[in-house]
Design a protein with these regions (language model features):
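A non-catalytic alpha/beta surface segment that caps or lines the substrate-entry region
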Residues: 20-65
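Midchain, well-structured core segments that form catalytic/ion-binding scaffolds
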Residues: 80-82, 87-97, 134-267, 273-282, ...
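Short, basic, low-complexity termini and linkers enriched in Ser/Thr/Gly/Pro
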Residues: 119, 261-279, 368-371, 375-381, ...
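Phosphate-handling active-site elements
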Residues: 115-128, 208-217, 367-368
Length: 402
């Protein structure tokens, strides 16, 4: 039903517009132009500190409670212009850099869905489109959206890979930053007068439990900086790390363990330390029996794909939306090997993933929901009930005559 060629061309256009985090102005200008062509009135919300623009939102009138479609428009940094090329059924980068399918694929899918709905005059739910900025640097854009600007009852974040997956769980994350202060000295003449901050940091890290802690928890030290010259005992080192967990008690315990490892080693070495921790986002779980997940499963099945409910170890805008009370799932559009020069977008999956989301919107439309396979949704007293099947037209007709 969607226009495959147009979808692919839109994606290729998007990835050639640079939009690294906090520098998404050109991308938003393009989206505003495209949305206005469709007759919509896009508007900005508050922008994050240091950003060129804020998040872009569009209200799409429709039937029933508001459904949010979300995709972030920023990418990780890259040193070369992205040149998309088609090769063996994939879109890849022809310039030895990232492709930008994370998350230009999601953005392109939303644009194509809006265009298809307009062209074919399809029934659809009321929607709020939310294009966020600065997702790649800690969900910064989504975090500054005023809660009263978000009108959706539930949401769909297009920010995944495999198109058969419905992501309904993600962890909390706490970041850790530490500065270790030692004492400088000449490394060849008076090394005993110094306190080696790098050595202290190394021994502290060696004490930490890192990597996969258990099935719910991970931890990492990802950045270490320090030292001025090879012949000077380093007097200052900075560390940056993180811990993630689906379990809040485990997360608190892990980040405390990492901080204590630094403190204890600094005490043993007569060094000083300053440690800061910051919660970046909160874990979420949308229960598998939630009507949104049931609808997503129905959309996948109706397009011939076996759905898989999945937990992820990464964070996304969905964490922010769930935290403020909007049940939001993550659905994939095919992105593969993201954030690397090997990144690629399988064309068939990209097209199919977009069609699945369009099918999901049909299922979420009250008028369409009267006659779908395989699920029927009915409103009673302000809540949604999932029924095993729709009433037959003949029975409905008899009911009307009665």
């Amino acid at each position: 039903m969607i226009n495959k060629k147009r979808l692919i061309n839109t994606f290729k256009t998007l990835v050639q517009i640079d939009s690294i985090s906090l520098k998404e102005g050109q991308m938003m200008a393009y989206l505003i132009k495209e949305l206005k062509k469709l007759g919509y009135k896009p508007y900005f919300t508050a922008k994050p500190e240091g950003g060129e623009v804020g998040n872009l939102m569009v209200d799409v009138p429709g039937q029933g409670p508001v459904v949010m479609l979300n995709a972030h428009v920023d990418t990780v940094g890259h040193s070369r212009k992205i040149k998309p090329v088609e090769k063996n059924g994939y879109i890849v980068s022809g310039s030895n850099t990232i492709l930008g399918s994370d998350n230009k694929a999601g953005v392109a899918a939303i644009l194509e869905i809006l265009k298809t709905i307009k062209e074919k005059r399809l029934a659809h739910p009321a929607m709020q489109i939310v294009f966020t900025v600065a997702e790649e640097i800690g969900l910064v854009g989504a975090r500054v959206i005023p809660k009263n600007k978000l009108k959706a009852k539930f949401g769909i974040a297009l920010d995944g890979g495999d198109i058969n997956e419905i992501v309904n769980q993600a962890p909390s994350q706490i970041n850790l930053k530490a500065v270790i202060i030692g004492k400088a000295a000449h490394a060849g003449i008076h090394p005993e007068d110094g306190i080696n901050a790098i050595q202290t940091a190394s021994e502290a890290i060696a004490k930490m439990k890192l990597g996969r802690i258990d099935k719910e928890t991970t931890a990492n030290i990802g950045i270490i900086k320090g030292g001025r010259a090879r012949n000077i005992i380093p007097d200052k080192v900075s560390l940056e790390g993180e811990a993630r967990s689906h379990n809040p008690k485990k997360l608190a315990r892990q980040i405390k363990h990492m901080a204590r490892s630094i403190e204890e080693k600094c005490k043993a070495k007569n060094a000083k330390c300053k440690i800061k921790t910051q919660k970046i986002y909160t874990s979420f779980e949308v229960k598998e029996n939630h009507s949104l997940i049931q609808a997503a499963k129905g959309a996948l099945k109706s397009t011939g794909i076996k759905p898989m409910i999945k937990s992820t170890g990464g964070g996304s805008d969905a964490n922010i939306f769930n935290a403020i009370g909007i049940p939001t799932i993550i659905m994939g559009v095919g992105a593969d090997h993201v954030h690397t020069a090997k990144e690629r977008l399988p064309i068939n999956d990209f097209v199919k993933g977009t069609e699945i989301v369009l099918e999901l919107l049909k299922i979420l439309t009250p008028v369409y929901a009267m006659f779908p396979p395989p699920l029927h949704f009915q409103w009673r007293g302000g809540s949604r009930i999932v029924l095993p099947c729709a009433p037959s037209p003949s029975k409905m007709e008899k009911g009307r005559r009665a």
